[in-house]
Structures are given as structure tokens and as C-alpha cells.
Amino acid sequence: MVAVIEPTSGSGYSALPMTKVELEKIRARIPASNNLIEHVGKGKTIDPISLDNILSNLQECSFAHFGCHGTQHPSNPLESALLLSGGRLTMEKLIQKCQASNGSLAYLSACQTAKSDEERPDEALTLAATMLFAGFPSVVGTMWSISDNDAPVVADAFYAHMFRHGTERPPDVTEAAYALHLAVQKIRDSGTEFWNWVPYVHFGV
């Protein structure tokens, strides 16, 4: 599993301090810590995340998790991107340079990763759809901005279900949609606002 976490602010975007908590939740849930590759941003000037390293890791991993800002380009979907300290990880780069031979699931804990074109919703190319094209048959995304406080709760409940068998047997990617349902139900039952739990969506198997 590859986890890419970007807690720092940049390019006019607010910091995402709870992404560090999100990573802690992943560490606690993954059955074998040696199967987790971490990329944690510290800012553009202090050891920025390498896009080349990310793309290389994505080609080999089974699970990929991104906790960062995301943006959907209004006129050129190929310029839609996950925003990292090392640069913009655009749809174009993902499509051109990433074909995940072992890919099973991509979890995009970032804003607008599944936001579509209001005028052509059936034709929109989103970041979530791009991960499907890149070789991940199951993808979790968001239709609009998500709460930084809710993200670790959703991720924790999601991976609690996916990794519930520990090292006895590998996670079943076909249960990703149900795992997301359980995770969203958890924050919904806590009394959070409607627009905080609705954005989470699943695509694929």
C-alpha cells in the first residue's frame, strides 16, 4: 500500500493537519507495517514529495491512498490534479505514466476527485475515473469538498472493514463499496451535516 499525505498548505490552499491523523489510522489498520510505503509532504522547500517516486510506486502497489487537496479543472479535465508539495499530479501524468499492474483500490481523500461537468455529467473525466484507467478497478472519491475532521474517521472505518481479517487473508476489493457505506454511516450517525457525508462515492467493482 502507498499512502501519500500532504498536510502542509500551498498555492493558496489551507493546511490539512488531520491528514496526519488519517495516516495514523492507516498505520493502525494495515496488517503488516512493512507493506506500507509512506510519502508525507513537509512543504515545497523542505523535502517535497517526488511525483516520479509516486508514479513509480503506483505501478507496483495494490492499494493507494491520497490525503491532500484536489482540484477539478473547469475546461481541461487533463489538468485536474492532486496537489502535492512536489507539484501537481495531473490526470494527464497519471494516464501517461501510470499503469498499475497490481492495482486493486485507490482511495482519494481529497476534494472534488469525483466532481463531474454539470452540463455533461455522463461524459466527464474525473480524477476518480482516471485512477480506474490507471489500473485500479475500485476507487473511492468525493463529489465536492470534504471536512478535514471527518476524513480520518471515514478512512479509519473503511480500512477497519477492509483489513478486518488481518494477515489471515488479503482484503476483498469487491467489499470496498460496502466498507465505504459503513464508514459514511458512522459519520452520518454522529450527527454531522448532510453535505459532510454525501460527497463520498465509490466507483468500479
Residue ranges: model-predicted function:
Residues M1-Q72, L108:
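A domain-level signal for caspase-like cysteine endopeptidase catalytic cores
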Residues G12-L16, R29, K44, L84, ...:
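Hydrophobic alpha-helical scaffolding
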Residues N34-H39, G141, A176-A177:
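Acidic/polar loop patches that form or flank catalytic/metal-binding clefts of enzymes
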Residues S62-F163:
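Catalytic cores of nucleophile-dependent amide-cleaving enzymes
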Residues A151-V205:
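An often Trp-containing, charged/polar helix-loop segment at the C-terminal end
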